Every structure is written in structure tokens, then in C-alpha cells.
């Protein structure tokens, strides 16, 4: 059963603000697929010949080569074997317990061994090779300059014990650079106990393209849409990506252009972005008599940093400033409306994988936005209270999008999605929460059933017949939308 305020579902003509929101590109990084980073198998000492069940009385253990973990920590790991008479197999178990303690702390290359013994007072020495970083080498070629790659590789702690989290983070960040892909191989170094990191590169094409076609449009501007996206991958060998996107509808009532550039900065995952867009529209269908048309122009500048980057979990902080200029013209009434908005958005995005109830993935995006809406003379007249919605001036809002993809087995999965927005006042159409669209309510076009504050819960059952094909069924009975009444009722 679906619930929504009747006023939220009333048809209202799209304007430049809604067109801006509808054509705003979704900035989602390409999937990064990197082969697992595997530690070399530990070399075990062979049992002494004809050792039989020879045992040695062990009062305590001594350790050599341990710097990352303290002797007290390692003593706790081998406590079950201290104060006993041990054979060779049991001594190896104590060595493996030391390795397990290192691996639990993230030192995935650490290896324990039994050096030649000089047993004194019942003490057995366990040596530790902590897997310290030796040399870092590049092999192969890519469009990304070696100097850029070494900005990332130089952050590996040379001479110190390597952790899986450190190596994995830098390799994943390198693979986010446009123009190349890379895999890492761990090899024994020249120095005893050291490990060399070899990064093998593979170049990507300079230009890539994608053609999209869908029926996600609005009846008044054209339901069927076609989009073309072009990417220039690292044309200046800096790992940057330049993108151009054009979208238009079958009726010709909507055309959108988007330009975007991303530049990696430093070697720890910082990225700067700049974007510009322009959309033009004219209304047909039920609103053709309005003779309405308009434009929506936008500029964006942003920065992003990965707080956590790994295979299993990620957390990213993004800050973006934007400025938009919106214009609507209604020929039937000779009315021209114009407005400008500017704002700052802070977004925290996280995702993680787990094995709960058969495994699944979770993604959460939380955004806080504050801005200023300035209206032209005619727009200000229509906006003024008590008859108008009073959207001019400062505004703020918080949005949340949470998704859970739960594996049910046999190519079947369940998707649970929560979309929520809370506004501090009545908002312009470019800032409203739209419940319509393919990602939310497929029964409504983009931007329909919109409001200042509201929530949507969606359940979707998915069956993947083949790896390249997913069938999805969304039941209206599984949808719940609840609108929160704003201070001054004004819901589109």
C-alpha cells in the first residue's frame, strides 16, 4: 500500500529548477576491480630427522625481530605453550600463534620461524620477519605519469612493517586514476626479511564513450531520452578525467549539456572537481497552452577525500560549492521569472560488505546543504507571503539515502531503500525532494510527487537470470511515502 499526501501528487508544470534537478548528473566513480593482494606462503622448517617424539621443557619464550608488536603482546599469544614439554610440532604451533597475532593486527606479511637455538633456562627463541617494505618498482605502461604513481607509492612506509590496509588503500587509489589499471605483486626483497612491491600497469584508451537510452523523462518534456557520455582519460598524464555529456528527449523539448573535470591531488586520495551544465526546455503535452520554456545554468566546484578506502568498507567526505541561474518564460501570459541560487553541500558517503544472513552490501549517503536563493522582481512578487511560498533568502536541508542489498541465495536478492529529506523552510523546486523517478517511484516521472520534506521506503525483489541481466519487480504494496508538513503549506 502506498501513502502520500494528495497535494503532493497534484500535477504542476515543470520549471527550470525541476529541470536542473532532473538533469543533474550522478557523480559515481567507475567500479574498481583489483586482484586480491596475496601474501607469500610462509616457509616452514622441516622437522629434525629421526626426531620422533623428542620433547623439550619450555619455561618461557623469547622473541627476536619484533618491532611492530611488543614482547608482552607476543607472550600473551604463546601463553598456552609456555611451562610445558613440547615436541617440534607443538613448537610450530606456537610459531603459528605468533603469526596469527601479527595478521590480526594487519601485518599480513609477517612470518615466524625457529632460529638455531641456544636453550638457556628453558627459553625458546621465536624469530619474526615482520614483512618490511624493501624496494618499490613499476612495470608495464599506462597513460598516468610515473611521477604521479610514485606520489601514491611513496606513502608506503619504506623500512617499516607493511599492513594490508596500507597497501590495499594505495593500490585502490591508484586504480581510481583515469588512464590506467594496476595490480600489485609481492616479491622477496634483497635484504633478509624485506618484501618488494611490484606495481604492474595496464593502459586504458584515451577516449571512452557510453550511449544511454531510457524512458525516465516527463510527459511534458519527452518521456524517451537519449544520452551520450564522452570521457577523456588522463590526456595530460596526470590521472585526470574530462567528461562531456549531452542528453535530449524524443520530442526535442529538453536538451542538457554537462561538462566535468576531475584532478587527483597529492598521493592520499584527494580529488578536485569542476563542472558546468546548461539545460533548455519547453513544455508540451498537458502544459502546451502555457507556451512555457526556460533555461537552467549551473557551475560546481568540489573536493573529495577518502577517509577509509578498502575492499570491504569505504567512507568518503565531499564538499561542493555551486551556483545556479534559472529562468522561466510563459508566453501565454507574457511572464518572465528569473532567480539565482548558490550553496555549499557537505556529503558523507559510506559503503561496506558483510556476511550477515548470507551476506550483502550497505550504502549510506548523508548530506547537509545550506544556501541562498535570490529572486528577480517578478519572481519575488509571486513568492511573497501570504499567498506565495516564501522561498527567498537563506535555506538549509538535510538528506539521507540508505540502501541495503541482501543476498537471498539462488541469484535472488532483496533491496531496501530509505530516502529522506528535512528542510528548514519552503524550498525552491531545484531543492525539493522528488519521489518520482526510476530510483524511487517508477510509476511517476522525475520530479513528480515532490515536497520540501518527506521520506520514502522502498522494497525491491531482484532476480539475476544471467550475470549481465537483472530482473526487478517493485510492488506498490511495498512502498511507503510520508510527507512532513512544512511550516507554511506549499507542496508541489
Question: What is the meaning of each model-derived region?
Answer:
Residues 1-5:
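Bacterial N-terminal signal peptides
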Residues 6-10:
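Sec/Tat signal peptide C-region and signal peptidase I cleavage site
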Residues 11-217, 247-255, 398, 418-420:
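Periplasmic polypeptide-binding modules associated with outer-membrane biogenesis and secretion
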Residues 60-62, 125-127, 196-198, 210, ...:
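Beta-strand secondary-structure signal
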Residues 86, 107-111, 179-181, 239-241, ...:
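Short secondary-structure junction motifs
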Residues 143-147, 163-355:
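Gram-negative/organellar outer-membrane beta-barrel architecture
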Residues 209-211, 230, 242-246, 272-276, ...:
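Membrane-embedded beta-strand positions of outer-membrane beta-barrel proteins
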Residues 327-489:
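C-terminal outer-membrane beta-barrel translocator/porin domains of Gram-negative envelope proteins
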